[in-house]
């Protein structure tokens, strides 16, 4: 059941003196876009009558087929709390439709919706809790972003050592004003690195929340004279930023990954889900780790995963099963980074896990030792493979995985791979 009707939104805009409404959507690479309308055009927007030029968005369509429609999702209506004065600004997240009023296959939100529908056909709801890390860097005298900070704080440090504490508090309060349930916030391992964790939700809401989270963090950081960076590895010699995703499936409101009688308290479905993720992980990596820079993070020595293995007892493998059981039982995938498109990340994770359940893919035994300390021969004996080592290898792995390509659809697969090949070629040409 929808939270808001069209009349609800029109009334809230009038009552709250909202002047501008951002019709937001996300491009193929996870960049937030918007068409802004004034309140006088709101009813037209809510009737799905707002158009934009899709050929201007990278990865969408050619100029000869450029007319596209924005279909607002009423339940995503939200008033931005950082502009409370006269003439407030609100937003609605939109789906993209073609000129003939069909869902656009290149819309990342549509890709996730399809995956969620596949899960629903099997009786499952896909719940996800992300762990979003970011850096707060200084701006230079011209107000341009840098990768510099005078801060030297570390894991769980507090002010006055933590120079970003006040900004982080404001981010938390702002996010709560926008309807987030913030579970924790703290300084991370590296200087100027932070994490804010919000409560899990069903997958589409979580992906929407990640996009909103990044916008709010960047906006509040700028108000504090800082630059919020979601780059996976902005500096050499320190831990990069990840976006771990904690995943579970529910059926009739019950977490089906939990089984008190099962091995490690896990159900067969949980093991099969892990098996599916491991089977398709190489093909998914260019989605979960989309930049040349992403692979600067995925190196030994900085707590980021490299090897395709799982464990319930240590954090060195790719997949971890946190200790909580019962309703909190979940599978944590540790490789995604915050530069990734959350809609595509959650879509490929869900469909890989569902493939594991459908085909009862049993994962290899859990790894109890530190994978980084194993010799090459020991890893080979255990069948432990590595993630792609760079963007070029990741592109090649997706090209080989027909299942993941089908999840993404022909349009996104073609345009995404084309763009990533160009990124790699540009990187190789740099001197």
What are these regions (language model features)?
Residues 1-431:
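Glycine-rich, acidic/polar active-site loops that bind/position phosphate-bearing ligands
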């Amino acid at each position: 059941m929808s939270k808001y009707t069209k009349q609800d939104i029109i009334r809230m805009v009038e009552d709250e003196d909202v002047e501008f409404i951002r019709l937001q959507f996300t491009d193929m690479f996870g960049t937030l876009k918007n068409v802004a309308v004034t309140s006088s055009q709101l009813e037209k927007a809510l009737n799905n009558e707002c158009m934009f030029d899709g050929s201007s968005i990278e990865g969408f369509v050619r100029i000869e087929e450029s007319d596209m429609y924005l279909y607002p999702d009423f339940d995503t209506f939200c008033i931005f709390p950082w502009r409370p004065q006269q003439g407030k600004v609100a937003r609605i997240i939109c789906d993209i439709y073609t000129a003939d009023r069909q869902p656009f296959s290149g819309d990342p939100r549509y890709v996730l919706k399809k995956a969620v529908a596949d899960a629903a056909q099997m009786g499952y709801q896909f719940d996800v809790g992300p762990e979003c890390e970011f850096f707060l860097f200084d701006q230079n005298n011209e107000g341009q972003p840098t990768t510099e900070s005078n801060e030297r704080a570390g894991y769980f440090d507090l002010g006055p050592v933590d120079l970003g504490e006040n900004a982080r508090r404001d981010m938390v309060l702002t996010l709560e004003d926008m309807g987030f349930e913030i579970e924790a916030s703290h300084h991370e391992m590296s200087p100027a690195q932070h994490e804010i964790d919000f409560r899990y939700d069903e997958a589409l809401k979580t992906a929407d929340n990640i996009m909103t989270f990044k916008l709010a963090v960047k906006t509040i950081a700028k108000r504090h004279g800082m630059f919020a960076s979601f780059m996976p590895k902005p500096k050499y010699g320190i831990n990069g930023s990840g976006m771990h995703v904690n995943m579970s499936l529910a059926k009739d409101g019950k977490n089906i990954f939990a089984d008190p009688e099962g091995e490690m308290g896990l159900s067969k479905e949980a093991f099969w889900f892990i098996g599916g993720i491991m089977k398709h992980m190489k093909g998914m990596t260019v989605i979960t780790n989309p930049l040349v820079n992403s692979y600067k993070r995925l190196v030994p020595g900085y707590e980021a995963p490299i090897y395709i293995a799982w464990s319930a007892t240590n954090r060195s493998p790719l997949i971890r099963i946190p200790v909580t059981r019962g309703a909190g039982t979940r599978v944590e995938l540790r490789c995604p980074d915050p530069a990734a498109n959350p809609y595509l990340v959650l879509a490929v994770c869900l469909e890989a896990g569902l493939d594991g359940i459908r085909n009862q893919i049993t994962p290899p035994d859990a790894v109890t030792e530190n994978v980084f300390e194993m010799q090459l021969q020991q890893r080979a004996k255990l069948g432990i493979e590595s993630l792609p080592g760079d963007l070029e290898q990741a592109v090649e792995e997706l090209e080989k995985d027909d299942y993941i390509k089908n999840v993404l659809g022909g349009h996104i697969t073609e345009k995404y791979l084309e763009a990533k090949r160009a990124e790699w070629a540009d990187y190789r040409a740099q001197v």
